[in-house]
Design a protein with these regions (language model features):
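A short glycine-rich beta-alpha junction/loop motif
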Residues: 98-105, 137-155
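Sequence-specific dsDNA recognition surfaces
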Residues: 15-30, 45-74
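Short amphipathic alpha-helical linker/capping segments at the junctions of internal repeats
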Residues: 96-100, 171-172, 181-197
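Non-catalytic DNA-recognition/assembly elements of restriction-modification systems
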Residues: 1-24, 184, 190, 195
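Short, structured motif recognition centered on aromatic/hydrophobic residues
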Residues: 9-14, 39, 72-79, 147, ...
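A short beta-sheet element
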Residues: 43-44, 58-123
Length: 204
């Protein structure tokens, strides 16, 4: 990003700037783990929503207690570790406290980073994240250790806030025309990606 001094930029790993939490799935053959559940439970297929205000499924307290599902706080970022097609490597911002399945990892930001900045940075890293995934092709997968070691560039908090403010505006513009003509949507998406890359291109 133009105007940011190299001396103000920190290069960290995701494990240094966030707590990484994995999820789990209660036994689906036990109805008491699912029927009339009240605990939001997110699957990797929902990461396409980008912002998570609700989940498609809920689990009961018994299901939660008898699985490796873990509650994570709002204003965190989830990333798909695995999933069909293009799902692996996608990220979403969670706006409520929820639990997830084992195909998602939640990154809970520490004081050094704003969650929305972390989200946009990882969104820009989609192809690279898929490249470093274990395995090959569509059968590959991310894991906690890969994420902990994954590099991220951290500018000062005021710069993070500026980046988020600008990209939020572009994000709204893209979403506002989602019902428009395909060519217009494609053009706006390319503009968004171009400016996102420019904003997140800090001095090396």
């Amino acid at each position: 990003m133009v105007g940011v001094s190299i001396f103000n930029i920190k290069k960290k790993n995701l494990g240094e700037v966030s707590d990484i939490v994995l999820g789990g799935t209660p036994n689906k053959t036990k109805h008491e783990y699912w029927e009339n559940g009240t605990i939001p439970w997110m699957s990797s297929g929902e990461v396409n929503k980008k912002k998570i205000y609700s989940t498609d499924n809920f689990i009961t307290q018994a299901g939660y207690d008898n699985s490796s599902a873990t509650m994570v706080p709002a204003n965190s970022t989830v990333i798909a570790l695995a999933g069909q097609g293009k799902t692996r490597g996608l990220v979403a911002r969670i706006k409520i406290s929820l639990s997830t399945n084992q195909s998602l990892a939640t990154l809970i930001p520490k004081d050094i980073i704003i969650n929305d900045y972390m989200y946009y940075y990882l969104e820009s890293q989609y192809n690279k994240l898929r490249e470093v995934s274990s395995g090959d092709g569509s059968r590959g997968g991310l894991n906690k250790e890969i994420l902990k070691r994954y590099p991220i560039v951290i500018p000062p908090i005021p710069i993070q806030e500026q980046v988020v403010s600008i990209l939020d505006k572009f994000d709204r513009l893209v979403n506002d025309i989602n019902e428009g003509l395909p060519k217009e949507i494609e053009l706006r998406q390319k503009q968004y990606e171009y400016y996102r890359e420019r904003l997140l291109n800090f001095p090396k």
